[in-house]
Amino acid sequence: MKTFIMTAVALLAAGFITACVSVPKHHNMTGTWKYTFEETGKNEIQNGSMTIAQESYAITGKCNDAFGEFNLTGSMSENSPKFMIDGKRNDGKREFHLSGSLSCDKEFEGTYTTDQNTSGTMKGKRVIAD
């Protein structure tokens, strides 16, 4: 009986360890990024920078470009390198929504829309990983 209980405890412990090891690693955007964006229909590329903090799948941060400084909130997908970020300018006069995907740990590409009825593409590169 004692051997049976010890075996059951060992199997239970092995199950917990296996379950902990099998948790998928998700992508992380934490760091400082430089990005470029181009509005659809215009031949002008703008530059900006953003600092992102990610905890679990939640994204927060700030970005700064020719249109001002924006507070960022968003989320990373649990099962893929896709993310969504919403930005709201500090004075509340401009907002954007970015849907993107990490192409590797250091780069992303995506499309954005604004509350000013504009849209375009955005590309970024991580310059500092925190």
Name each model feature, range by range.
Residues 22:
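Short, conserved catalytic or interaction motifs in soluble domains
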Residues 25-130:
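Central antiparallel beta-sheet cores of small beta-barrel/beta-sandwich binding domains
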Residues 18-19:
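C-terminal motif of bacterial Sec signal peptides marking the signal peptidase cleavage site
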Residues 10-15:
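Core hydrophobic alpha-helical transmembrane segments of single-pass membrane proteins
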Residues 1-8:
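Bacterial N-terminal signal peptides that target proteins for export
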